[in-house]
């Protein structure tokens, strides 16, 4: 089949820079909205999740820096998706803890069961997304590979921060304050 060009345009580097700037602003606005939402929805636990989320983003940028990756618009999209998945992991855990508070014997047990019962869902979702990132990296080129690298690093850091960082913050807080009841 013959290929017919309907239109051809040449764009300058300013358009790419403008797109990156717009993407960065969108990320900042979305990030702030997520931080506010988590605190309003989950109180102190939302604060713990936010600290873990900030650590998560820092780890992603650190890993990208180590491998010498350039942040592109698809890379920003990968970070945004990663933030969503990191928040989702904490929401799954916190909702599970809320459920366990109704039946568990005390808040410590509710926290423990919440993490235990949410773990498989979090791991499954992140493994399938990581496999997708690996496939995109190996089969894709250019922007698709950049998206896949950012997403892959993000999945690794998200699992770490959701399972270990947030949980550690909650355990440290709980062991120091020993509350009789908790609100999630």
Where are these regions (language model features)?
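Extended, hydrophilic extramembrane loops/domains of integral membrane proteins
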Residues: 1-7
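Residue-level signature of catalytic and energy-coupling elements of molecular machines
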Residues: 15, 34, 63, 91, ...
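Interfacial segments of transmembrane alpha-helices in multi-pass membrane proteins
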Residues: 17-72, 138-142
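Short helix-coil transition sites and intra-membrane helix breaks within transmembrane domains
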Residues: 26, 47-49, 85-90, 123-126
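Hydrophobic alpha-helical membrane-associated segments
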Residues: 33-39, 85-89, 157, 161
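Small-residue-enriched core segments of transmembrane alpha-helices in multipass membrane transport
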Residues: 47-68, 79-84, 147-162
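Hydrophobic alpha-helical transmembrane segments of membrane transport and translocation systems
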Residues: 62, 99-184
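Membrane-embedded alpha-helices of multi-pass transport/permease systems
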Residues: 87-90, 94-97, 167
């Amino acid at each position: 089949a013959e290929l017919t060009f309907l239109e051809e345009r040449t764009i300058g580097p300013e358009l790419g820079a403008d797109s990156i700037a717009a993407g960065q602003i969108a990320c900042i606005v979305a990030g702030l909205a997520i931080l506010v939402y988590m605190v309003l929805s989950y109180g102190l636990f939302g604060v713990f999740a936010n600290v873990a989320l900030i650590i998560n983003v820092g780890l992603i940028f650190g890993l990208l820096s180590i491998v010498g990756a350039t942040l592109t618009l698809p890379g920003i999209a990968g970070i945004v998706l990663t933030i969503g998945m990191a928040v989702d992991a904490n929401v799954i855990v916190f909702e599970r803890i809320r459920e366990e508070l109704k039946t568990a014997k005390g808040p410590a047990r509710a926290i423990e069961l919440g993490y235990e019962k949410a773990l498989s869902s979090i791991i499954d979702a992140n493994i399938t997304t990581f496999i997708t990132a690996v496939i995109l990296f190996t089969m894709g080129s250019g922007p698709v590979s950049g998206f896949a690298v950012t997403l892959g690093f993000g999945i690794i850091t998200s699992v770490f921060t959701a399972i270990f960082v947030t949980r550690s913050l909650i355990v440290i807080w709980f062991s120091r304050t020993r509350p009789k009841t908790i609100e999630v």
